[in-house]
Amino acid sequence: MTLFHFGNCFALAYFPYFITYKCSGLSEYNAFWKCVQAGVTYLFVQLCKMLFLATFFPTWEGGIYDFIGEFMKASVDVADLIGLNLVMSRNAGKGEYKIMVAALGWATAELIMSRCIPLWVGARGIEFDWKYIQMSIDSNISLVHYIVASAQVWMITRYDLYHTYRPAVLLLMFLSVYKAFVMETFVHLCSLGSWTALLARALVTGLLALSTLALYVAVVNVHS
């Protein structure tokens, strides 16, 4: 039962990444090592973020929820956008190729670093626990989030982006950066359960994805 549970969690977490890699056409461009380079950039950015947070923001321990402090901590996630832009700027090719390489490499590195060990240790335990299923589903939400963020960074860095689209792209980028902070605050204030919080995050990410897709299509069509 424990091995079967681990297999289910592993498949739910990792197979969507493999399917995305195969179906997006990246395998035809031999982009595997480009994705690995994106993953290495992710590790460097996360190290810088950890050092910055540990230096300037003390850990919140109980008591009143520190909204200002948590907001400032969430602002550090801007570094992810800078890292994604760095990855895309080092890759030549079409926009969708750059977006998928950066997003898939970034999300895969996060998956390996933050969820691989918990799944291996926890999902193989004696007792069944839904939190590992939730963790696997959350990894798929993260993949969508990074694809959305990469598309937003690609659009905002276009030198020929129409000025009428720039405010909309900046707004979506702001929402992407502070989405985790807003969701965490909402869950804290409303005392939501784990499944409800996961559903809320999926809905918010889906809305951002649809909005970004509509804007991306508009930008591409204008410049085609």
UniProtKB/Swiss-Prot annotation:
Lumenal topology: which positions?
59-66, 125-129, 188-194
* Tissue expression per record: Expressed in T-cells, B-cells and monocytes.
Q: Give the transmembrane ranges.
A: 1-21, 35-58, 67-88, 99-124, 130-155, 165-187, 195-216
According to Swiss-Prot or TrEMBL, what is its membrane topology? Multi-pass membrane protein
Assembly and binders: Component of the back of Sec61 (BOS) complex, composed of NCLN/Nicalin, NOMO (NOMO1, NOMO2 or NOMO3) and TMEM147. The BOS complex is part of the multi-pass translocon (MPT) complex, composed of three subcomplexes, the GEL complex (composed of RAB5IF/OPTI and TMCO1), the BOS complex (composed of NCLN/Nicalin, NOMO and TMEM147) and the PAT complex (composed of WDR83OS/Asterix and CCDC47). The MPT complex associates with the SEC61 complex. Interacts with CHRM3, CHRM1 and AVPR2. Interacts with LBR; promoting LBR localization to the nucleus inner membrane. Interacts with DHCR7. (Microbial infection) Interacts with H.contortus GAL-1 (via domain galectin 2).
Q: Function, please?
A: Component of the multi-pass translocon (MPT) complex that mediates insertion of multi-pass membrane proteins into the lipid bilayer of membranes. The MPT complex takes over after the SEC61 complex: following membrane insertion of the first few transmembrane segments of proteins by the SEC61 complex, the MPT complex occludes the lateral gate of the SEC61 complex to promote insertion of subsequent transmembrane regions. Also acts as a negative regulator of CHRM3 function, most likely by interfering with its trafficking to the cell membrane. (Microbial infection) Involved in the immunomodulatory effects exerted by H.contortus GAL-1 on host peripheral blood mononuclear cells to down-regulate host immune response.
What protein name does the entry list? BOS complex subunit TMEM147
Q: Which organism is it from?
A: Capra hircus
Lineage runs: Eukaryota, Metazoa, Chordata, Craniata, Vertebrata
This chain is encoded by the gene named: TMEM147
